[in-house]
Amino acid sequence: CLVGSEMCIRDSHKEGAAASIQIGHCGNMTHYSTAGQIPIGASSGFNLYAYTPVRKMRRDEIMQVSKDFGKAVRTAHAAGFDCVEVHAGHGYLISQFLSPYTNHRRDEYGGSLDNRMRFMRMCLEEVMNAAAATGTSVLVKHNMYDGFKGGIEIPESIEIAREIERWKVNGIVLSGGFVSKAPMAVMRGLIPIYTMSYYSPLWLRAFIRYCGPFMIRQFPFSECYFLEDAKKFREALQLPLIYVGGLVSREGIERALDSGFELVQMARALVNDPAFVNKLREGDAATRSECDHRNYCIARMYSVDMKCCKHCGDLPRKIREELAKLP
């Protein structure tokens, strides 16, 4: 089972909450050191995220990985989770098959949108079969758009969402952005380049500091930054939809719920203040997260633990100086 998850699940159930876990495959964003081999993806190429070549998946590997999604559901259920969230966005493996930016295949898994959805359908079939056998709920995280020219745009994404809906999943989490190409389209806000380089391997630091500002497009933060685009999906779909993206206040959450979304997700607001939801529950209409979206937590999360800079008493001097300069 999943070592270390028992306490989290037990405490969630004790408080009356269901426990969900995200399942997915990084594909071409997998680090060589993690995989122990050249990473696989929808197509061959080079992974700028982990600085390693990528090998196109064979048909037998596609079949095996899709079955592994079903195994992941059964593993999650055995560990005590009530729900799984299939990650089909942000440029991870399912998203790599869906996006024309990363899918250059000339077989039945590439080309037309129907072909590019084939791997996703295979994964969902395995997931839904395992979910039916175990009584596990299923959510799917889905990209509304990739965030750059040549990627998935909203009209095509709505067709993908309709296909997901046909599999009778319990809900879709609407997101956007592509970590290996447009990471800040996912998260928005400031880009702490020095902090990113500080927590990277020594050989990589200079590249990030000097090339990072030119490679990473900035997307300004605004509260509920995905909401207007997400409303287009609300109009097109019947299943429950979950809004995520820039929720930092009671007013923002109410805007999302009043727009027809059944549930909301938050991340950085809770990294900043784990008690944020309880404060909302206490009824203070002015409750607002103190997260300032300087994204220190994002800059360090792939190298060390994810932590808000406001809770780090041992920040290195140069990182403190960088954060102080950010508006």
Could you describe each region identified by the protein language model?
Residues 171, 246, 259-279:
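Glycine-rich phosphate-binding active-site loops on the catalytic face of alpha/beta enzymes
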Residues 32-57, 96-115, 191-215:
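Aromatic- and acidic-residue-enriched carbohydrate-binding clefts of CAZyme catalytic domains
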Residues 1-9:
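Single conserved hydrophobic/aromatic residue that forms the stacking wall/gate
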Residues 18, 24-81:
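Non-globular sequence segments
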Residues 181-196, 271-289:
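C-terminal helical cap(s) of enzyme catalytic domains, especially alpha/beta-barrels
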Residues 155, 161, 247-262, 266:
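Catalytic cores of alpha/beta
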Residues 163, 167-235, 239:
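Glycine/Thr-rich beta-alpha phosphate-binding loop at enzyme active sites
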Residues 280-327:
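Cysteine-cluster motifs in flexible loop/terminal segments that predominantly coordinate metals
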